């Protein structure tokens, strides 16, 4: 039996590209499905050019591959179910459906995985916003489709209600009580259907709702770090996870609150390529293939900086002046404002000395 596989990746962005690179290093072949022929993954894999919801193209990908995976959660789960056998998609479509809908996600996290989440309620129309205790702050989020701050409205006072009511009338939403947190953190976990590998706790700093800087290890107590890891592993085991998952959390002075999950490698885990003995992409490929997972070790404290479209030249200059920094550019042809173009990783004992772009 050939131990080298053909892996199909749905999505050819930077995550698909880095998954493909990890798979190729292990000796596997990669075919990617993406709507554009010049996507980042096209530099390292064959690409089937078709929309993500093209059932015929998904079927073609499935027919040519031993195993399928996806680089982002907005994939047509019904379309996948129609053409892919369960054994061919180890991550499954249940995880997709949970992570595509905040209502399903909150229910899973709170009631099935048994982890702490912010107090929330389901909102089906603006009527559900009547009688809010406006001494508290809330975040109204659409149940589906939101990313990088889109599809969200913070409610701090009555002045914010008209916009919130408009959002609530446009789509199903989740209303969360705002968490007064000290830090935003995340934990990457990878599973092979049985065992779970866990990465160090990451501290995340956002600018305009886009990740700007990740610091590893997160600057929280050992007790809170252990709790965050245990919660992430608890979620992974409840899911019988195959592949990599990111659990995004808030750290308060004495507790960890789970915010959301991403069923794939995550921007905040990119540091692991250089800073750990195995990256989140390595363990993702091992996980979806059902292979044994390593114990993850962090070589030294590290910082990752995102390179957005407006930062490209600044990042190139930075690496020229700091030759120990690792620059990753994803090969996107157009450097749009706030578009993720690459990242920089470097080892740093004092994260505050490393300024964001």
Task: Indicate where each model-derived feature is located.
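Residue-level signal for inorganic ion chemistry
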Residues: 23, 68, 187, 284, ...
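A conserved helix-loop-beta module that forms one wall/lid of the active-site cleft
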Residues: 91-153, 158
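Generic C-terminus detector
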Residues: 329-357
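Short beta-strand-to-turn element immediately C-terminal to the catalytic PLP-Schiff-base lysine
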Residues: 123, 152-157, 188-192, 216-218, ...
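Short, conserved charged micro-motifs
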Residues: 128-131, 160-163, 312-317, 350-357
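Phosphate-binding core of ATP-grasp and ATP-grasp-like enzymes
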Residues: 167-220, 226-258, 262-270, 278, ...
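Short glycine-/aliphatic-rich beta-strand segments at the starts of folded cytosolic domains
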Residues: 297-308
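ATP-binding N-terminal substructure of ATP-dependent carboxylate-amine bond-forming enzymes
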Residues: 1-100, 104-107
């Amino acid at each position: 039996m050939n131990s080298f596989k053909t892996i199909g990746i749905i999505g050819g962005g930077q995550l698909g590209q880095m998954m493909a690179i990890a798979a190729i290093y292990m000796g596997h072949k990669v075919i990617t499905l993406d709507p554009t022929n010049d996507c980042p993954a096209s530099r390292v894999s064959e690409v089937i050019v078709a929309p993500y919801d093209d059932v015929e193209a998904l079927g073609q990908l499935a027919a040519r591959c031993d195993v399928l995976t996806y680089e982002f959660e907005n994939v047509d789960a019904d379309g996948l179910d129609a053409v892919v056998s369960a054994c061919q998609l180890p991550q499954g479509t249940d995880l997709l459906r949970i992570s595509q809908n905040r209502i399903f996600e909150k229910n899973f996290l709170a009631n099935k995985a048994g982890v702490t989440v912010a107090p929330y309620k389901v909102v089906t129309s603006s009527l559900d916003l009547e009688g809010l205790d406006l001494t508290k702050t809330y975040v109204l989020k659409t149940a589906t489709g939101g990313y990088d701050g889109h599809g969200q409205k913070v409610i701090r006072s009555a002045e914010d209600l008209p916009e919130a009511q408009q959002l609530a009338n446009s789509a199903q939403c989740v209303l969360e009580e705002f968490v007064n947190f000290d830090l935003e953190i995340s934990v990457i976990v990878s599973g092979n259907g049985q065992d779970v590998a866990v990465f160090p706790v990451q501290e995340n700093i956002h600018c305009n709702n886009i990740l700007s800087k990740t610091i590893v290890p997160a600057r929280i107590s050992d007790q809170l770090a252990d709790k965050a890891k245990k919660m992430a592993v608890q979620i992974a085991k409840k899911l019988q996870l195959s592949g990599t998952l990111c659990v995004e959390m808030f750290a308060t002075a004495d507790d960890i609150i789970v915010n959301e999950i991403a069923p794939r490698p995550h921007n905040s885990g990119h540091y692991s390529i250089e800073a750990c003995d195995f990256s989140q992409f390595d363990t993702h490929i091992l996980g979806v293939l059902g292979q044994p997972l390593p114990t993850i070790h962090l070589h030294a404290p590290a910082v990752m900086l995102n390179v957005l479209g407006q930062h490209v030249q600044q990042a190139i200059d930075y690496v020229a002046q700091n030759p120990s920094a690792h620059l990753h550019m994803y090969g996107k042809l157009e450097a749009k404002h706030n578009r993720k173009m690459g990242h920089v990783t470097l080892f740093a004992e004092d994260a505050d000395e490393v300024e964001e772009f």
